[in-house]
Amino acid sequence: LNRREPPLFPNFKHLPVAYHGRASSVTISGAPCRRPWGQIVRPGADGPSFEPARMLDYEMEIGAYVGVGNPMGYPIPLAEADQRLFGLCLLNDWSARDIQGWEMAPLGPFLSKSFMTSVSPWVVTMEALAPFRMAAANRGADAPALSPHLNDPTDRLDGGLDVTVDVYLLSERMRADGLDPALRSRGYFRKNYWTVFQMMAHHASNGCNLQTGDLYGSGTVSGPSREEMGCLLEITDRGALT
C-alpha cells in the first residue's frame, strides 16, 4: 500500500516470497556446509535460473542464549534483560549472497540463509563475562533519542562487552598444503551499536514470549576498516575487491 509503482517487486512472480528464522538448521561448528541451490539472476540474464550458489559467504556474529523467558503479552524491561540472558556463543550466519540478492525484496533473506547456521559448541555464561562488561558504545552526536524501551542508565553504563572476534580462513587447499589458518578479519563487539540486552528487550517489547534456550544473533560484527569487516561481502565490496 505504501508503494505506488511498481505494485509488485520483480521476484514476486518467480518465487513465494517469505522470511523466517529457522532453528532446525542451526548446527555445531565443524559440521560440513553443503552449497545451497536457489533462484539466481546472473548479470545480463532476463530472469532467474535455479542453480548452486556461487557467492557463499560467512557472517561473524555473537549468539545470545535466553536463560529466563517471559510470559506471552508481557515485555522484558531493559533493566531486567541482563538477569534473563544466560550466555553467549560464536555464531556464523552462512549466507548465499547471489540467492539473497534476488529473493530478499521486500521481506528480507529466506532460502539464502535458512540452509545453515553454525554455533560454537561452548556457551560462555554472563557470569564469566562480567569482567568484560563496559559502557555501551557511543552512538554518535547525530543519533536520535533512544526509545524508552531501549533506554536504561544501567545498560548505558555497562551494557557493552569488550569481546574481540577473529575470523580465520582455512581452505581445503591450505589444509592439503599444510598451511596455517589465515587471519581474515578482527572485529570488536564493544563497538556494536546495540547491546545484547537491548536486542532482547526489543524482541520482547511487543509481548513476544521468549523461552529458555532461545537463540538470537547480534548481526555481523564489523567495523569501519577493512580489517574489521566480518563478512566477505563487506571485505570485497560486493566482489569488486580481492
Give residue ranges: language-model regions.
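Active-site microenvironments in enzyme catalytic cores
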Residues: 1-185, 193-197
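Active-site pocket scaffolds in enzymes
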Residues: 193-205, 211-212, 216-242
